From Swiss-Prot:
Modified residues (Phosphoserine): 86
Organism: Lagothrix lagotricha (Brown woolly monkey)
Protein localization: Cytoplasm; Nucleus
Name the record gives this protein: Tripartite motif-containing protein 5
Species classification: Eukaryota, Metazoa, Chordata, Craniata, Vertebrata
Coiled coil: 132-224
Domain B30.2/SPRY: 280-547
Modified sites of kind N-acetylalanine: 2
GO MF annotations, alphabetized: pattern recognition receptor activity; ubiquitin-protein transferase activity; zinc ion binding
C-alpha cells in the first residue's frame, strides 16, 4: 500500500520531458510543471522550428514571463528523492533509484544498468542499450581478464615494495657501516694526534731533563768557583791586615795564584738555537694515512715456505720465522741462508702485507724474484735489484738501510789531487762518476737528477762488512743507503705494484710514513715475498688485516 502511494506521488512530481523527479520545477499557465532545464531546452527548440511557445503536453501557448517556480512540487520531489535513495527503499532491490522500476537494461555509453524509463529519458536518448543478461557474460570475461591483470600488477607492486624495503634496509646497513667507519677513521686520526702530542711532550720532557741537568752541573761548578775565590780573597785580606812577616811569607805564590785565576763561564743554551715546536702538518699526516689505507685495500694472505736449507725456522701456521743456530759450522755461503720466501708468488697486480719486527735487532725483508731465475743464493752480496732483490733491513738494532745496486766501473773516475769539479765535468755523461765522487765521505751531501727522471741521494759506497761481520768481502757489495727513522718501526708494510714496477715500504707504527720506495724495478720472473730474521733470535711475524 505504501509502495503504491509512493508510485502515485512520484508520478505527480515526475517531469514529462526527462521522466525524472522534478528539479527546480516551473509551472505553465496550463498548470503543467516541468524541470527548469527541460522547459528551457524545449522552449528554445520550439521557437527555432515553430516560432511559438506551447506546452509539450497539451500544446497550450504560454508566455515565458508567466513561468513561475513551484516550491511545493520542489519540496515533494526532494523528499521523495531522499526516500528513494535510502538503502531500504531503493538499492535494497534491483530497482532504479530515480524511477523505482527494475533495472533490466544496460547502457553501453554510460556503462550503467538502467530501467525502461531511463532508456526513454533525454539523458539516454540515442544510446545503445542491451538486456543485462545479454552483456553479463561478456563483461564477466572482461572483468576476469582485468582481475588477472590486476593480480599480476599487484604481484609486481608487491615485488617493487619488497625491493624498496630491501633497498631501504641495505641503505640503513651501508650508512650504519659508513658511520662506523667514519667513527673509526676519526678515532684513528685522534689517536694519531694524541700520539704526536705524547711524542712532543716526551721530547720536551727529555729536553727539560737534559737542560736542567746540565744547568744544575753548571750551577755547582759556579758555586765551587765562587767558594774558591772567596777563600783566595780572604787569604789576601788576611795578609794585608797582618804583620810584615805574614804579608811577605809566600807572597809570590799567592800573587801567582791570583794571576792564574780564570773566570769559568757557565754552560748556557741560546734560546734561538732551541728546537721550536711546530704543530704537525695535519694535511700531510692525513695524506700519508690515506695512502696507507689505500694500499691496505690490496692485502694479500702470505705464508712462509722454506726455499732452501736454512737457519730459519718456520712456525706450524707458516706465519712466523726465527733464526736457529746450526750445530755444524756452516760454509761461507751457507751462513747467509737466513732467508725464506713467501707464498704465493705474484706475476701481476697490486699486493700488500705487513710484518711484525718488534724488538728485533736485525732483519731483512722485501721481495725477490724466483731463485730459479737468478741462480743466486741469498747472500748479502746479492741483495741488489739487479740480482732480483728489493729489500730493506736493520742491523745492530739501530741502523736501518736499503740495499741498492753497486756502482761498478768507477775506478777510472776517482778524483785526483782533490779536483772534484774537473773530474765531474769531463765525465758528465757517466753518472757513475758522480756517484763515486759525490759521497759524504768526500764531504758531499747532495741530491741529483739524472736522465730527466731519476732522482737520487748520493751515499757512501757500501762495504760488505758494513752489514755483516766482515768475514767475507767482495767488491760487488750492494750500495747500502742509510734510512733515518723518527719512530722505530714495530710493523713494516710492504706494497708491490707489479705493473708500476715499484716496491714500497711503510712504517705502520708511524701512521704509515713511507720508509723507502724502489722504482723502475725489472720483474722478469714471478716475484716472491722475502723474509730474513738474520741472526736475531726474536721472530718475524706476518700480520693479519684484523690485527
Amino acid at each position: 500500500m505504501a509502495s503504491e502511494i509512493l508510485v502515485n506521488i512520484k508520478e505527480e512530481v515526475t517531469c514529462p520531458i526527462c521522466l525524472d523527479l522534478l528539479t527546480e520545477p516551473l509551472s505553465l499557465d496550463c498548470g503543467h510543471s516541468f524541470c527548469q532545464a527541460c522547459i528551457t531546452a524545449d522552449h528554445k527548440e520550439s521557437t527555432l522550428h515553430q516560432g511559438e511557445r506551447s506546452c509539450p503536453l497539451c500544446r497550450v501557448g504560454y508566455q515565458s514571463e508567466n513561468l513561475r517556480p513551484n516550491r511545493h512540487l520542489a519540496n515533494i520531489a526532494e523528499r521523495l528523492r531522499e526516500v528513494m535513495l535510502s538503502p531500504e527503499e531503493g538499492q535494497k532491490v534491483d530497482r532504479c533509484a530515480r524511477h523505482g522500476e527494475k533495472l533490466l537494461l544496460f547502457c553501453q555509453q554510460h556503462g550503467n544498468v538502467i530501467c525502461w524509463l531511463c532508456e526513454r529519458s533525454q539523458e539516454h536518448r540515442g544510446h545503445s542499450t542491451f538486456l543485462v543478461e545479454e552483456v553479463a557474460q561478456k563483461y564477466r570475461e572482461k572483468l576476469q581478464v582485468a582481475l588477472e591483470m590486476m593480480r599480476e600488477k599487484q604481484q609486481d607492486a608487491e615485488k617493487l615494495e619488497a625491493d624498496v624495503r630491501e633497498e631501504q634496509a641495505s641503505w640503513k646497513i651501508q650508512i650504519k657501516n659508513d658511520k662506523t667507519n667514519i667513527l673509526a677513521e676519526f678515532k684513528q686520526l685522534r689517536d694519531i694526534l694524541d700520539c704526536e702530542e705524547s711524542n712532543e711532550l716526551q721530547n720536551l720532557e727529555k729536553e727539560e731533563e737534559n737542560l736542567l741537568k746540565i744547568l744544575a752541573q753548571s750551577e755547582n761548578d759556579m758555586v765551587l768557583q765562587t767558594q774558591s775565590m772567596r777563600v783566595l780573597i780572604a787569604d789576601l785580606e788576611h795578609r794585608l791586615q797582618g804583620s810584615v812577616m805574614e804579608l811577605l811569607q809566600g807572597v809570590e805564590g799567592i800573587i801567582k795564584r791570583t794571576t792564574n785565576v780564570t773566570l769559568q763561564k757557565p754552560k748556557t743554551f741560546l734560546n734561538e738555537k732551541r728546537r721550536v715546536f711546530r704543530a704537525p702538518n695535519l694535511k700531510g699526516m692525513l695524506q700519508v694515512f690515506k695512502e696507507l689505507k689505500e694500499v691496505q685495500c690490496y692485502w694479500a694472505h702470505v705464508t712462509l715456505v722454506p726455499s732452501h736449507p736454512s737457519c730459519a725456522v718456520i712456525s706450524e701456521d707458516q706465519r712466523q720465522v726465527r733464526y736457529q743456530k746450526q750445530r755444524h759450522r756452516p760454509s761461507v755461503k751457507a751462513k747467509y741462508f737466513y732467508g725464506v720466501l713467501g707464498s704465493p708468488s705474484f706475476t701481476s697486480g697490486k699486493h700488500y702485507w705487513e710484518v711484525d719486527v718488534s724488538n728485533k735487532s736485525a732483519w731483512i725483508l722485501g721481495v725477490c724474484v724466483s731463485l730459479k731465475c737468478t741462480a743466486n743464493v741469498p747472500g748479502i752480496e746479492n741483495y741488489q735489484p739487479k740480482n732480483g732483490y728489493w729489500v730493506i733491513g736493520l742491523q745492530n738494532a739501530d741502523n736501518y738501510s736499503a740495499f741498492q745496486d753497486a756502482v761498478p766501473g768507477t775506478e777510472d773516475y776517482q778524483p785526483k789531487n782533490g779536483c772534484w769539479r774537473n773530474t765531474g765535468l769531463r765525465n758528465a755523461d757517466n753518472y757513475s762518476a758522480f756517484q763515486d765522487v759525490f759521497q759524504p765521505k768526500n764531504d758531499y751531501w747532495v741530491t741529483g737528477l739524472w736522465n730527466a727522471d731519476n732522482y737520487n741521494a748520493f751515499q757512501d759506497a757500501g762495504k760488505y762488512s758494513d752489514f755483516q761481520d766482515g768475514s767475507c768481502s767482495t767488491p760487488f757489495a750492494p750500495l747500502i743507503v742509510p734510512l733515518f727513522m723518527t719512530i722505530r718501526p714495530k710493523r713494516v708494510g710492504v706494497f708491490l705494484d707489479y705493473e708500476a714496477c715499484t716496491v714500497s715500504f711503510f712504517n705502520v707504527t708511524s701512521n704509515g710514513c713511507l720508509i723507502y720506495k724502489f722504482s723502475n724495478c725489472h720483474f722478469s720472473c714471478p716475484v716472491f715475498p722475502y723474509f730474513s730474521p738474520m741472526t736475531c733470535k726474536l721472530p718475524m711475524t706476518l700480520c693479519s688485516p684484523s690485527s
